[in-house]
Amino acid sequence: MIFSQGASPLKGDFSKIKFSIASPESILAHSRGEVLKPETINYRTFKPERDGLMCEKIFGPTKDWECYCGKYKRVRYKGIICDRCGVEVTTKSVRRERMGHISLAVPVVHTWFFRSVPSKIGALLDLSTKELERIIYYEVYVVINPGEPGAKQGIKKLDRLTEEQYFQIITEYEDNQDLDDHDSDKFVAKMGGEAIRLLLKSIDLNETAIHLRKVLKESSSEQKRADALKRLKVVEAFRKSYEPQKKTRKKAVGLFPEDELPEPYVFEGNKPEYMVMEVVPVIPPELRPLVPLEGGRFATSDLNDLYRRVIIRNNRLKKLIDIRAPEVILRNEKRMLQEAVDALFDNSRKANAVKTGESNRPLKSLSDALKGKQGRFRQNLLGKRVDYSGRSVIVVGPELKLHECGLPKSMAIELFQPFVIRRLVERGIAKSVKSAKKLIDKKDQVVWDVLEKVIDGRPVLLNRAPTLHRLGIQAFQPVLIEGKAIQIHPLVCTAFNADFDGDQMAVHVPLSQEAQLEAALLMLSSHNLILPQSGKPVTVPSQDMVLGMYYLTKSRPGDPGEGRIFYSDEDVLIAYNEDRIGLHAQIFVHFNGAVDQKFDPLRVLDTIVDPKSEKYTWLKSQLEKKTILLTTVGRVIFNQNVPDSIGFINRVIDKKVAKELIGRLSSDVGNVETAKFLDNIKEVGFHYAMKGGLSVGLSDAIVPDTKVRHIKNAQKDSTKVVKEYNRGTLTDNERYNQIVDVWQKTSNIVAEESYQKLKKDREGFNPLYMMLDSGARGSREQVRQLTGMRGLIARPQKSMSGQPGEIIENPIISNLKEGLTVLEYFISTHGARKGLSDTSLKTADAGYLTRRLHDVAQDVIVTIEDCGTTRGLHVYRNIEEETSGQIKFREKIRGRVAARDIYDTLNNNVIVKAGEIITEELGDLIQETAGVEEAEIRSVLTCESKIGICSKCYGTNLSVHQIVEIGEAVGVIAAQSIGEPGTQLTLRTFHQGGTAQGGISETETKAFYEGQLEFEDLKTVEHSAITEDGVEEIRIIVVQKNGKINIVDPDSGKILKRYVVPHGAHLHCNAKALVKKDQVLFSSEPNSTQIIAELHGRVKFADIEKGVTYKEEVDPQTGFAQHTIINWRSKLRANETREPRVLIIDESGEVRKNYPVPIKSNLYVEDGQKIVPGDIIAKVPRNLDRAGGDITAGLPKVTELFEARIPSDPAIVSEIDGYVSFGSQRRSSKEIKVKNDFGEEKVYYVQVGKHVLANEGDEVKAGDAMTDGAVSPQDILRIQGPNAVQQYLVNEIQKVYQINAGVEINDKHLEVIVRQMLQKVRVEEPGDTELLPGDLIDRSAFVEANNNVAEKVRVTEKGDAPSRIQEGQLYKTRDITKLNRELRKNSKNLVAFEPALQATSHPVLLGITSAALQTESVISAASFQETTKVLTDAAVAGKIDYLAGLKENVIVGKLIPAGTGLKRYRNLTLTGESVETISHDASDDASTQNGI
């Protein structure tokens, strides 16, 4: 690594770091002396040996201001070099920065450049790693110059020779050895590092590059081109390392005389021979310490051992050379030296790594010190230990304010000790620091008074590990408390994910003024009420507080004082305090403000007041005028805490309402008022939870009486299913699915009834029901298990078919109150254990996902206000998604900037203008306006900012509801927002105790709205069938795939809902008919896909042979035979093929229709049978994964999407719009052809047995899946382009988070990550740019490369141009035009030229791991993964890290370029109009006099 000159690298201000291969000169320039001896310290004196690995002369003194021999002591001799021992008198800290060196007897190859993949040395010399290894380890000679003997023998440069061949040539041509080494006729062959060095030195990089480019252009062999490209990449990397230097040299030459250029400008770029070392640097001794242990033993760093081996072998080799030892011995010693240096640099790569004596573990080399979690980057540079910090157990502090935390006095005095000491000395209470310390140790009362003063207004930071998102560290104002535990406010527990079962927290003290200011303004807990991931409140009351508020605001019919009328709130409170009215009594209060209520008071009025009385009439008129309010006493008490601007909240307050209310408050009245409100409702909640005496007893869990009846019915139904199976009308798969259905329905009915029973118990005041209904604790699922029945349980191991989610078909009938039988208990233990083990395994996965996300997005910062793009993202209203509880249209557009005007098409007016922010209110308005079907919004995905992103494309900062500020680290926030719920996603499994909760297979689909029906692409046939009662009925059967039924609003013609009708469904309605809500539209069989006949005719089997392509299973009880298609490939001979299909033929025997039948399908027709439209030909069973709830699908699915992996069994996707036809059948695959109207045809080969979704003649669009399986994101990118794949990834990841965990993450966070995955392009044709085919580069770098050649031309014929103009080279258009003008004037031949060709490329979708490794920053990539590879590549290419991201700045110890650390904010000067003088505080004087 090359640093600017100076005593210590990296001191002072620097803006970039350059990586390059260290030349022998630069190693010597950094060295303070040569290490000659392997010794470290003297065994008697324990002082460092001279010229050894710890030598004071080379590395500096071991004691401050004292030389080795003791002649010079004390600071006054600073800088003097002792004439006796040669040690400079200075501080011992120099032993952390001074380096030494070892001069090697023979050159040694650096293992990084030789063993990296692809090998850098191998690529330059065109040698394989194996051949290189043989040369480097002295096994064969390599020809460096064939000379005259070589020419005669037919030997070329780089040929390998054995020892015999070498000596044969040497003896044959003895005179040859007398020639000078530089003579071209001399035959030279060598081995080892020396040979490699000479070969590398002889390489002309420019010539090699020209030659390789020529091969690339002209060679027809694919292999040759691939090899040339691999080599060219390394050659170009070396050539690039010269480029930045040329520019800096140009600048410098004018400033300094040529021979006095400073070191950075002398650097000429990387020379290939630098990869072979003549000098090995020795790192400072303090970085490889030797530590004395008790008992006179020493602990040493492994590096000392490795250096010792190098020095011993090097010294031995020097001796052997001096005494002219035989070649064999020398060669062996040289090989051992090479191995010793290899081990020093990278010991883990070697198969026979050097191991320690005692524990037999491999020694940690220099590479290991950088790599991995314990390496230098992650252990010391990214995660440092912090002073002024402490940790302790946390307990709840219910009396604290939201911005406060309770800090134990003993901790506070330790943390703030220096400040207390200073204050004690300043005020004359203590004479010196020592006496102040004594006072503190005595715990004098005055110390506590001073401490109170010191901490006043000084926030502290509290952190709970794991810090998954930024709310894991918050600032609080400390309050001194007795005891040893930190107290925290109950409302911040959610943000920290803390509970009080032994959790610990760390305290940090911000020291500088800036740090204190940022902590107080940005990190104070009362300023962090909103979750950055979704914009929803995070400080929401939970558990007791929710229960207390719910109890307080609930009404109870017949409570004392019901129906009384009060003039004001005060009157109500007085009456309640005097015990005249009950807490839950429904009363009337005069009120004129805004009211938030969801019920109609007129409907319940007659239950409170006699309808015949005058009071009723008067109250009714007042309620209609809205001058009086029907509410409860509790709600009046609750509303004392609600700000007036919000109005009167006349609702039962459960968790959901509380969350909504806090959200409204934070956006309407700001954080200060909201924090006050939160503190007040915390008090109220705890108070009334206590007053209500709400606790759970066994009698509160009530089992419904109807449970026994429902279970009997279910047992009857399942017996009926088994009978049908025995009769042969059902397959085993259908039997299983139907039995599971029966029990799932029963389980749900019992659960619902037990819930209703709880609801009615004690007029809704059953504690268990209140806890559940208020959202304080528990779920319906838990009530079902407590009082209903535990239901179906997922099967432990994966089933034979590899389906993880199979269900045991015998349910657990008991519930937890009644108790389980032994067998039931045994079955249910599995789920509980699996939950716990899953949790621990998956937490690590989620953490690793977070780390990768953070690494890929850490440099995404808001850099400019507006990038000026005209592109945007189209967001559509999807009613189906909204009704199924997914994200609403409003959520997708809220907080974004409109890219185009948003119109209401029905009323033809603009709701939002382009460039405006869609606020909360506008979002609600758009959601409710039926005329807005879509909106085009600015998005991170379409942002055209070159560095980072712009604030217009990002939209609002979700945690403050305002447009994002420049400098916001949105990449880190995105990574945290996705990673934090990732762990929650994981921790969900065991809450269900492994019970199966899959969706009940609903066979009937009902209308969601009233409206008129419209059929779209719906092809049907009529079919007569005999019902169970023996009556014939005509059914309408759907025979088209993907047909749709739309419900349309008859007035506006707007589609309200769209249903996709499955193939084989039975229609219950007609086109254009008017339907009511919940009317049945169609019914379908959910457990199988049906193949339905569309024509009259006769069945003919093709390739359906018993024992070959189908098996016959006869049920022993019924005698009924079931025909199932089997996987027949193994039964055939080579080149033999089959394609089982059912043909429908007419009377003449001509084939009318062809139906391929996939493997595992069950046939429902016989060969030769007559068939009518609507008959079932076959059923393909669906494997329903019913076990649902387990996240096993969740986290791996998210990882698969973020890593852009190709699914294990991807669907085959059409690349063009067109019509499907089937081609020929092969042994293991069949052809599907798609042909469009322009005659273009694409052919796809589908594996036999894969279910084909498309039928002959079907129309498909580009991107449609034609077979089952997941669609690969790479296919979407290739066929539909980057926009489609971005949308696909965002939507798919959202689905996993919402469906599996119900977690809400704003789209913009996913967009930030997906944008990073598509930042790179792959060069296809480089044109005349300097790019290489197959290069993976940043999109902006690609555009820049093309812009560089846009103004240039390539000379095809130079004419009479001067010699500086070369054919095939690029020149600026204006220069050549000017030259041609001059040539024309002089009647000379003009220069012929053509425009320079631009490069072409295609976008590449990278997974987050590879995207993080491909980042522009070397330091960031190196600290992520594959450290040695990243550093090797960077050094070869002479890369410069411009320190643009966050991570690299943390590593080099600079302020991060985000937030207040942005360059533009660094050197602000404040100018003020007037200066205000602040009077001296008299109270401070008084306190001084009192001795504080």
UniProtKB/Swiss-Prot annotation:
Keyword Zinc in record: yes
Manner of cofactor binding, per the entry note: Binds 1 Mg(2+) ion per subunit. Binds 2 Zn(2+) ions per subunit.
EC number, UniProt record: 2.7.7.6
Pfam family membership, one: RNA_pol_Rpb1_5
Keyword presence, Disulfide bond: no
Record-listed Zn(2+) 1 binding positions: C67, C69, C82, C85
Family, per entry: Belongs to the RNA polymerase beta' chain family.
InterPro entries reported for this sequence: DNA-dir_RpoC_beta_prime, DNA-dir_RpoC_beta_prime_bact, RNA_pol_asu, RNA_pol_N, RNA_pol_Rpb1_1, RNA_pol_Rpb1_3, RNA_pol_Rpb1_3_sf, RNA_pol_Rpb1_4
Binding residues annotated for Zn(2+) 2, in chain numbering: C867, C943, C950, C953
Organism listed in the record: Chlorobium phaeobacteroides (strain DSM 266 / SMG 266 / 2430)
Quaternary assembly: The RNAP catalytic core consists of 2 alpha, 1 beta, 1 beta' and 1 omega subunit. When a sigma factor is associated with the core the holoenzyme is formed, which can initiate transcription.
Gene name of this polypeptide: rpoC
Keywords assigned: DNA-directed RNA polymerase, Magnesium, Metal-binding, Nucleotidyltransferase, Transcription, Transferase, Zinc
GO terms, biological process: DNA-templated transcription
Record protein name field: DNA-directed RNA polymerase subunit beta'
Sites where the protein binds Mg(2+): D499, D501, D503
Annotated function: DNA-dependent RNA polymerase catalyzes the transcription of DNA into RNA using the four ribonucleoside triphosphates as substrates.
Example of a GO MF term: DNA-directed RNA polymerase activity
Cofactor: Mg(2+); Zn(2+)
Top-level taxon: Bacteria
Reaction(s) this enzyme catalyzes, per UniProt: RNA(n) + a ribonucleoside 5'-triphosphate = RNA(n+1) + diphosphate
GO cellular component terms, semicolon-separated: DNA-directed RNA polymerase complex
